């Protein structure tokens, strides 16, 4: 830490930036440490970089050798961890093999191509679903089953993420008593019905973001994935309300992490309550773009 200050200099800022800077430094320090969690995030990143090149019509042998070597090294390290059979690890291995084919037989190489697929969902149906999504704070006394929670979690990683890192980790409880206790950690958790069906913490593993310039990417990545969940929730008759985590204090942060067993390397981006609405809130008018 002191080396970073000497090497990069320092500035004086208002005291209200203290918590923000402390959080950023904490996550930056964690991201610099080696771990399997960091390796798999970076593995997806480097596999994504190779994948982009392997889709190009003008792809040529000889490019991105450093990326290839880093990816190969990461896959080898992960082969002795719990991530060895992870679907994305197997996917990354296929990119590695395709890259090797390009180097060995460039003249006969055929770039990657996906299947031609036409969506069966019309623009009108999609817009209708988007407009149907509504934030609600009053819920029926009806439990949200584990099966539905699993189905909602399955859609989160189908959103885009920076360099395909897929950093999102979800921490959820469908115990109404427990959910209500979690809600008390959020300053925006007011005006809710007494029955709180589920509580969700949307987090990003910080270990895949190793540069200061990437500081805000976890918030972008999590938000993109979360939108998938809220749209999918509407298809089950569920509605969710997002709760900002920007105003949390030290005690609230510690308490929520304890309640949901959220590790230190997961950045809590925001939280949410999801359940069956007791009644629908009116739709606010939207401005034109």
Summary of predicted features, one role per range:
Residues 1-289:
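Acidic, surface-exposed loops and disordered segments
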